[in-house]
Amino acid sequence: DRSVSRGLGDVYKRQLWESELYIQEFEHKFCNLLRQYLPASSISQRFFETEMKNLHMYGYGLKSIMLSMTETICKVTDGNGNMHLIEEVIGWGQELLQKPVTLLEGVKETISSLHGKYKLVLATKGDLFDQKRKIEASGLREYFHHIEIMSDKKIDDYQRLIDTLGCPPEKLLMIGNSVKSDILPVLELGGYAAHVPYHVTWAYEQHEGEIRHPNFIRLDSIKGILDKL
C-alpha cells in the first residue's frame, strides 16, 4: 500500500533491541528460586499481580521488576525468607542492567534506509536511566530526530508527544511489537501503525482479537516496512 507514504512526516519506532526475552528469563529464574514455597506457576501469578498493583507507583522497567520481585518474596515467605533470596534478585537484576545491547535482526539496516527520508522518532517507555544507557549503547542515536522516553504509552501520552513535535496524527507511522501500547492508541488517534510480531510478549501487553483498521499494517519483520513506503 504505497499510499502510506503520502505526506508522511514522522516515523516512530520501538523494540529495537533484545529486551523482553531477557526479562522473561529473569522471571523464570525468580520462580525457580522460590519453588520450595510454591509451584513456579503460582509464583509467576503472584509476581504478576504484584507488578500490576505497583505499576502506577513504580512505572515500567527493570528496577520496577526488581522491587516487585522483592515484595513477592516477602509475601510468599510470610516475611521469613532468607536474605539470600533478595540478594539473588538484586544480583540478577544488576547483571541485566549492565547487559550489552543486542539489536534485533534488520533494525540497523531499516533505520539507516529510512534516515534522511523521514523524521525518525524513538518512542519507548521504561526506566529513564536504563533506557538512556541502551540508546547510547545501541549506536542508533544519530539516526533519530527526536527520542522520547515515556512513562506510559496510552492515547494521551501519544497526543502530548505529537503536539510537542508538531506532527498531525495522519502523518504519523508507528512501528512496534505491542498491539496494546504501539498500535491501538496510534490508530485511535488517526495515525498509521505497523505491527511487527515478536516471539515473546509480556502478559500485560498481550492482545486478543483481530485488528480491522484501514491504517493498520501487518509486517513479518521490521524490514518489511521498506516495501510499504
List PLM regions with ranges.
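Asp-based, Mg2+/Mn2+-dependent phosphohydrolase catalytic module
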Residues: 6, 108, 112, 119, ...
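Short acidic, Gly/Ser-rich segments with clustered Asp/Glu that frequently serve as metal-coordination loops
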Residues: 14-16
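Single conserved hydrophobic/aromatic residue that forms the stacking wall/gate
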Residues: 1-12
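A metal-dependent, Asp-based hydrolase signature
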Residues: 42, 46-95
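Conserved phosphate-coupling serine/threonine residues in phosphotransfer and NTP-handling enzymes
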Residues: 124
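Long amphipathic N-terminal alpha/beta scaffold segment
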Residues: 88-108
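Basic, amphipathic juxtamembrane/active-site segments
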Residues: 20-35
